[in-house]
Amino acid sequence: LVGALGAVDLTGYSCTRLSVTMNSTTDFMSSVSGDSTNPTLVETTTSFYHATLGAATPNGINSVLFAVYPDLPYDSWVTVGLEGVPNAGIGEAAVATVQSADNPWTTNFDPGFGQPGGNISIDDPIGGAWYALNGDANGIAGDDLKVLVGQFTTDGDLSGQLYCQVFIEGD
């Protein structure tokens, strides 16, 4: 990204979208989860950019606001197939998160109010996740066989590993 977007300068930042590729158009991406045995990590060598109106998930991001808040499309978030407010009319539903008291990964990743975010480390004994419920349209692979699981904007190096739950053919 280059230059100022409203009051925010994202020069030197990259915005990366991660998707899980499936084998069938009807495969269902249920969750990205982690615990001490099967950790999920999304890390940067610096911090993650978070827009003031952004959140840990894109559930409340309305593209109507992009003209007034030009940095909002570059907010960092985790998802299951959504890029913004879910469209219930086509069967989409909000992405949910769960975290343990000992590892508040959601709060570490998105501290709120546009503050820089830390790494996602879901690696404690209890674990955590972001997920959609089976049957939510946003989790279905579709014709491109992909489901978006996150957008990460950083001026550092991005790395990690994801532990994903997929229902083959939706079962």
Predicted regions and their residues:
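Non-catalytic macromolecular-recognition regions in eukaryotic signaling proteins
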Residues: L1-D171
